[in-house]
Regions:
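Nucleotide/phosphate-binding loop and acidic/charged catalytic motifs
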Residues: 153, 221-226
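Extreme N-terminal basic, low-complexity initiation segments
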Residues: 1-13
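A charged, well-structured terminal subsegment
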Residues: 184-190
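A structural motif shared across PLP-dependent enzymes of the aminotransferase-like
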Residues: 152-162, 182-184, 232-240, 261-266, ...
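Active-site phosphate-binding/coordination module
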Residues: 118-184
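Short glycine-rich phosphate-binding loop at a beta-alpha junction
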Residues: 123-131, 428-437
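N-terminal glycine/serine-rich phosphate-binding loop of ATP-dependent small-molecule kinases
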Residues: 10-12, 16-17, 21-146, 269-272, ...
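Active-site core segments that coordinate phosphate-bearing ligands/cofactors
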Residues: 59-60, 164-176, 190-202, 206, ...
Length: 477
């Protein structure tokens, strides 16, 4: 077998890596030149001298806080093609006064989607799972300890000050580079410790690692997802033993971290591979953007940031509550913004039967001008999102369109604030913002974002997370 061609893939319009559109001489040159840039996704297709090509299929399982999807990807004549084969709903479940994830139901959906992929495409070379960050499953030996708490649960509220009494947040940020969020893994594990839940626990797996464990039996600890929780050293890219010791957490729970691209096992003949298992980590890998351009991964949360060579943990970043999360060979300097959570909750309360096209049209027609602080804690997990808006506004919205106009304008202004902070903290000006995810399909919000930030918005209505997941699997070969 010889390398017969190297092709450029995959987003319309196709982006070529070389100005003259010529292929690289060999696979090594291709790999050297294609990292860490994501100007284009490049893949090698190996064929015979006669040009016969055997298609290889890969499966990305991408699960968000409100839904999950299974997407098969393959390289067909130089074009990366994808097909969604399964989609399912997700959401928190209230159990004994706490918000939890039905992890067994998620496992069932993961397996069902895999079967759908095999029914349609036959042999699947490999699969990988990505999800949101910070949440985890505790294990006693091979048995899961339930419930699996969801990050919007309030169980950490009472222990934040206690944690910061043992290690000041300024020190925590300096060591780990992670912004303050009351649901960070560091606070959740401390709450478990206080409640006695860690007694006898032998391991904890982040949600995607647990789902892959249920497939192949291998316990893994992937780097990008681990960094979301406020426990990984920004200097060493491993768990910070001093933070762990300061909080009295069991040191044995914190294993060496594994990088994206690692094969951890097999499931019914398919390799199980670690992608960037934090969904934003995979999403950034899937964005075809200019080097060092800001991005917004717009879903339940909006993550706005840039790639940097190393973490930025200075005082300005701490005071502005910026985060440093692991990427595939780079750091993601970014900020969490409340995102489509606001819009989705308003819709579920005010107009669950309306399509988003109709909602956006009503928001555009509205003349309501007040806004809210989209990142206020009042919007994190309210009993009623509409009531939370009412309490924050001096003039009550008079229509459904008013609520949504307020929400969209508030999000755009939060993007503006974040971009201004980014430019101050990095000492650079940026001309464009690349937006992917569900929010990229909202032309009204994109226009508001352009007006608020003064930046060109490049909206890419693509499944960037799944594409990044697939890219990592394919590049492994």
């Amino acid at each position: 077998m010889k390398t017969s061609a190297i092709f450029t893939a995959c987003f319309p319009p196709a982006l070529a890596c070389r100005p003259d559109n010529t292929a690289f001489a060999n696979k090594d040159t291709f790999l050297e030149n294609s990292r860490p840039s994501t100007n284009a996704l490049l893949f090698c297709i190996i064929g015979t001298e006669q040009g016969a090509i055997s298609l290889k299929y890969y499966l990305a399982v991408d699960i968000g806080a409100s839904s999950g999807r299974h997407i098969v990807g393959w390289n067909d004549g130089g074009e990366l093609k994808t097909e969604e084969v399964y989609r399912f709903p997700n959401g928190v479940t209230e159990l004994d006064g706490h918000l939890t994830w039905d992890i067994d139901a998620l496992t069932g959906h993961v397996k069902t989607g895999i079967e759908r992929a095999r029914e349609k495409f036959g042999t699947i070379e490999s699969l990988s799972v990505d999800t949101w960050g910070v949440d985890y499953v505790l294990l006693k030996g091979d048995e899961a300890l339930y419930p699996c708490y969801a990050y919007r649960d309030s169980r950490t509220d009472s222990i934040i000050d206690e944690v910061h009494g043992k290690i000041a947040f300024s020190e925590l940020h300096r060591r780990t580079g992670i912004q303050f969020q009351p649901f960070n893994t560091v606070y959740q594990l401390y709450a478990d410790q206080k409640a006695g839940r860690l007694a006898g626990v032998t391991d904890f797996l982040m949600i995607p690692e647990y789902l892959m464990y249920r497939l192949c039996g291998a316990k893994s600890h992937e780097y990008t997802n681990a960094t979301t929780g406020g426990l990984v050293s920004a200097a060493t890219s491993e768990y910070d033993k001093e933070v762990i010791a300061a909080l009295g957490l069991p040191e044995g729970l914190f294993r060496p971290l594994q990088q994206p691209g690692t094969v951890i096992g097999e499931y019914e003949g398919m390799k199980v591979v670690l992608c960037a298992t934090h969904d934003t980590g995979s999403a950034v890998e899937g964005i075809p953007m200019e080097e060092n351009a800001p991005y917004i991964s717009s879903g339940t949360w909006s993550l706005l940031g840039i790639k940097t060579p190393r973490p930025i943990t200075d005082e300005a970043s701490e005071l502005a509550n910026w985060s440093n999360e692991g990427g595939v060979g780079y750091n993601r300097y970014q900020k969490n913004i409340m995102g489509m959570w606001l819009v989705n909750r308003l819709r579920s309360e005010l107009c669950p039967d309306k399509q988003f096209g109709e909602i956006v049209a009503e928001a555009e027609a509205s003349r309501y001008e007040e806004t809210v602080d989209a990142n206020a804690n009042a919007f994190l997990a309210p009993d009623s999102m509409a009531a939370a808006f009412d309490a924050a506004l001096s003039e009550q919205p008079g229509s459904v369109g008013d609520y949504f106009r307020c929400a969209y304008r508030s999000l755009a202004l939060s993007y503006m604030d974040a971009v201004q902070e980014l430019e101050r903290n990095t000492g650079r000006e940026y001309g464009a913002i690349y937006i992917v995810g569900g929010g990229a399909k909202n032309a009204f919000l994109n226009r508001l974002t352009e007006e608020a930030t003064g930046k060109k918005v490049v909206a890419l209505p693509i499944e960037a997370t799944a594409l990044g997941n697939l890219k990592i699997q394919m590049e492994r070969e």
